[in-house]
């Protein structure tokens, strides 16, 4: 079964809002680093920093390399990054070495400036994780600029979070904004 790693980030004053949104998206108690089999678009949440479509997980880095080698990945113009997280803090040089080390087990060519795809490596609670990386680039962010400085409308981060809570990640639901155009 396919698994996904999610990393959340929030300002301290928005912890409760982030935890509530997390509960409605995943139907679980909040965790800042979370592994699940639910595939949720990273762009729908203001709090999702990143997502990894997991290829392999292992407590031993050498075993992780062997699993990546066994899967026989081949990518042109890929890049391996280390995804920082608040739980584990390997030394910076170690993260560079690990990214370089695992990239030898991926066939293809490396492109550091314009990669496609970006692969992420991270370590959480003594578990090494690698896979495709998705960084949130929310399309709704373009609405962050209010039409006027005196606008009464909700902050876009709050509005997006309320939509996620109300919709519970059900993409088939249609919602109507009763104040549409209030601006």
Per-region residue spans from a language model:
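SAM-dependent Rossmann-like transferase core, predominantly class I methyltransferases
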Residues: 127-169
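Conserved class I S-adenosyl-L-methionine
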Residues: 171-181
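A broad, low-specificity signal marking well-ordered, structured residues that form hydrophobic/aromatic
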Residues: 78, 119, 128
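A generic local secondary-structure boundary/capping motif
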Residues: 108-110, 119-120, 164-166
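Short, amphipathic alpha-helical segments
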Residues: 93, 115, 152-156
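Short beta-strand micro-motifs enriched in acidic
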Residues: 122-124
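Class I S-adenosyl-L-methionine
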Residues: 111-116, 141-145
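Non-catalytic nucleic-acid substrate-recognition regions in nucleic-acid-modifying enzymes
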Residues: 1-112
């Amino acid at each position: 079964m396919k698994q996904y790693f999610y990393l959340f980030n929030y300002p301290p004053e928005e912890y409760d809002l982030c935890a509530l949104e997390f509960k409605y998206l995943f139907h679980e108690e909040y965790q800042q680093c979370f592994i699940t089999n639910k595939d949720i678009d990273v762009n729908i949440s203001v709090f999702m920093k990143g997502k990894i479509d997991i290829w392999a997980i292992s407590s031993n880095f050498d075993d992780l390399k062997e699993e990546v080698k066994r899967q026989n990945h081949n990518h042109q113009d890929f890049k391996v990054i280390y995804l920082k997280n608040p739980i584990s803090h390997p030394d910076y040089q170690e993260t560079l070495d690990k990214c370089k080390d695992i990239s030898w087990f991926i066939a293809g060519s490396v492109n550091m400036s314009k990669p496609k795809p970006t692969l992420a490596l991270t370590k959480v609670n003594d578990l090494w994780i690698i896979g495709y990386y998705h960084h949130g680039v929310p399309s709704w962010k373009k609405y962050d600029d209010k039409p006027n400085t005196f606008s009464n409308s909700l902050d876009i981060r709050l509005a997006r979070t309320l939509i996620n809570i109300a919709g519970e990640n059900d993409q088939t639901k249609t919602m109507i904004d009763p104040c549409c155009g209030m601006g």
